[in-house]
Amino acid sequence: MHPRLFITTLLGILLFASCQESKQSTETTPSDFKMILRLWPDHHNDTVLRGELLQAMRTYPNTFEEVWFCAEIQTLSMDAHRKSAAAMAVASQQFRELVITPSLQAITLGHGDSFENGSEDLVPTEWSTITDANGIVTRACHCPRQPKYLAYLEETYALYAEKCQPAIIWLDDDLRVTHHSPARQLCFCDTCISQFNEQYGRTWSRETLVEELETNSGEDGVRQQWIAFSQESLAGVARVISRSVHRVSPKTRMGLQHTNFHRELLEGRDWNLIFKAMEEETGLVPASRPGNGFYSDHAPREMVMKGYDMARQIRRLDPDIKEIAAEIEGYRHYASGKSAHGLCVESLLYLSMGATQLSYAIVCSASEPMEWYADTYFKKLQEWRPFLEEYARYNAGTEPGGWDPYISPQHVIREKQPGEPPFGWITTGANDALLHLSYLGFPFCPDGNHASALVMDAEAISGLTPDEASRLFQQKGILINTQAWEIMQRRGLDTLLTPIPVPEGLNNVSCFVSAQGGRTAVIPSFDASIPNSQRMNLLQIADWAASHQLPVIMESMAQAVVVPRVDKKGQLHSVTLLNCSISEQQETRLRLRGCGADKKQTFVWKKAGQLDVTLHPQYEGEDAIIAIPTLEGWNIGWLAIN
């Protein structure tokens, strides 16, 4: 063969092989991925600020494909809303010219009397406000069942929708039952009590209803009735708004911004009644924005807790809801709050928890010069965007796997505990503390559909109904601590299980089985401040309880968060690794389940700003052993398993 022909042929073969490897490592499915910038009213009202923002978008193109304008939040004046809507319409067109889609967010009931700057213009004169269980009345947070208030919402939302024709209108996370300061919960006003009595054929006053909710002694489930009634109150607000929007802007979809209220049991288990009302009125599938605080990264591990909070919210959504825009919040939007790198790490972590989109509240207050926001935040996010989008596309159709920190759907009807304060049953911190084990590589999947097993603390055990407890402990793998075991004994649940000798290789644990194949492991505590030998022992105990089905085990000593993604068959699809320590993390050994040599899989390590690295595993039966390369302090990457 002629030398030149040989070289040409060889280059062609290498190029083909390279393309095949690239295709194999990055092959994805369609996704709903978007990066979104959230705004406040000044961004459309102030023409100078608007111009600066438009220029920032030109400087860093293809970073955000959508913005959420914000309706006025400090007034009930329709004249003020009309002026604002006119300015928003102009701004919407200007952003469309940059191929950036305008959407809109607006408040509903009000976060609290002082949250929206305590404006006197927010105090209603034509309808009543929220009254809580103790008779505390808000000044500026609105009762959701007041006809004139609903008429106001109908007119206001229709005004903005007609002028701007937004892609989505988002109802703010003040559409909630609890925390409308100074009111602890809604709504015990005369209107709501009267309608509740009419619906259920009762004659409660506020005082007698509160007493019955506290004891929950009747057979008709007053707590459940009141929660359902409260959820219907919120859904009624969403229905009125959705109907008015659809009338003037039929292509506009609705969205709900919600926060993590699985701790606030009066909220109910999910927000699906609101989403259902939105879809019924518009005929369009709504969108979700889960969130829950974490306003600065001064204590960066809090992003992990927020991530797991959002994972639980996401799993409770109707499966038809695919647009899930995680809240990345920088309130008060100071340079001293969130770091650019922190925003990027947070972004991938929330995608790993199940979000499909990212919404950034990082410029809202305009407290810093727009040029600073752009050159600091926009620039870094633009650099990370391909990395984030690839993850979202690759992992579409999968969800986090591992341990489900289980909370009963019926936790709210648990019995009152001795010495418990009034209305102590309306909140729970079940399983919060044990999530700190995630910093040591324990994979969690709150409310996961494909969880390997369950993990519960004493409070979670207290919230189980008898039938539920019987079913779970007879059929599932469960990890609990001694405090939870004491609750089980007190409730007679220990009789469901038979003790067995501690399996070889495990220490400091009591093990039990059931006649139906359940496994229960009881450990002293969920303390995360432990030496590595105890960490590995605890992981092995957890794996035994899961019948050796944990999708991934971090075998190296590291302070790292491990998030496996599994498909509908429970097959491992990817693993995200977050170094949640200050120090550089040396090679990290991961044991990947169900990835035996016969699968002929490839393992590609991905990190922002660096070339992909194909890793070569060792095999032990159906397990692949992978060494993840060095990972810097507070950095994140992910392993694609093809």
Regions from the PLM with identified roles:
Residues 7-17:
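Bacterial N-terminal signal peptides
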Residues 35-46, 70-84, 135-154, 218-236, ...:
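The substrate-binding groove and active-site-proximal loops of carbohydrate-active enzymes
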Residues 25-57, 63:
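Boundary/entry segment of secreted carbohydrate-active catalytic domains
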Residues 60, 65, 71, 113-115, ...:
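Hydrophobic targeting/anchoring helices
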Residues 425-429, 434-440, 444-449, 455-642:
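A conserved amphipathic helix/loop scaffold
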Residues 53-57, 69-125, 241:
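Aromatic-lined substrate-binding rim segments of carbohydrate-active enzymes
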Residues 101-164, 181, 192, 196, ...:
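Active-site-adjacent "subsite" loops/lids of carbohydrate-active enzymes
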Residues 141-176, 234, 244, 383, ...:
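An active-site-proximal structural segment forming one wall of the substrate-binding cleft
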